[in-house]
């Protein structure tokens, strides 16, 4: 199993070497160890869990920052240690599927706007990360329907979409 993980990581590194030099995040099929990975912009990606070999793949593809939206009981302490040991910046803004508060969105805004790029925003599945991305885009003035579509593409599911609509679309 370790051999397979090492092989997958090396394969990912090989495929994404040109992107590392450009400072752009890779497309989804190019970052295998990160679940439900999607490219939101040239500098920002959104995903679910970072799997075995995922932190190494992030480093190899040029990522500088990880914004983790999971709660402490989802393993954030271990991930923080791995990410920081690899030389990346780590932010944790714990949130649940209960919705996004103004305080959480403010903390996210501060994190994303101060982050070194490229940046990965993630949670357990991509649902919360997609919802946070959509909420941020709405607050920044993007057309709400376009922001929600971006959130859906990143993994936001209907129950979280409704919470985003209720909280941030007036």
Task: Report the location of each language-model feature.
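Cys-dependent protein tyrosine phosphatase-like superfamily
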Residues: 19-119, 133-170
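Glycine-centered small-residue hotspots that permit tight backbone geometry or close packing
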Residues: 11-13, 126, 151
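A phosphate-binding catalytic loop at a beta-strand-loop-alpha-helix junction
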Residues: 119-130
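Positively charged n-region of N-terminal signal peptides that target proteins for export
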Residues: 1-5
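Bacterial N-terminal signal peptides
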Residues: 6-18
């Amino acid at each position: 199993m370790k051999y397979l993980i090492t092989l997958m990581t090396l394969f990912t590194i090989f495929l994404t070497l040109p992107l590392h030099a450009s400072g752009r995040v890779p497309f989804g099929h190019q970052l295998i160890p990160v679940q439900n990975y999607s490219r939101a912009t040239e500098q920002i990606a959104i995903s679910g869990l970072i799997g075995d070999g995922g932190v190494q793949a992030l480093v190899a593809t040029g990522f500088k920052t990880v914004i983790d939206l999971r709660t402490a009981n989802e393993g954030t302490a271990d991930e923080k240690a791995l990410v920081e040991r690899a030389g990346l910046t780590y932010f944790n803004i714990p949130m649940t599927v209960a919705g996004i508060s103004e305080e959480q969105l403010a903390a996210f805004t501060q994190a994303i706007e101060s982050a070194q790029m490229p940046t990965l925003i993630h949670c357990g599945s991509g649902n919360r990360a997609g919802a946070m991305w959509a909420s941020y885009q709405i607050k920044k003035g993007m057309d709400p329907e376009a922001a929600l579509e971006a959130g859906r593409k990143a993994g936001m599911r209907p129950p979280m979409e409704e919470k985003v609509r209720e909280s941030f679309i007036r």
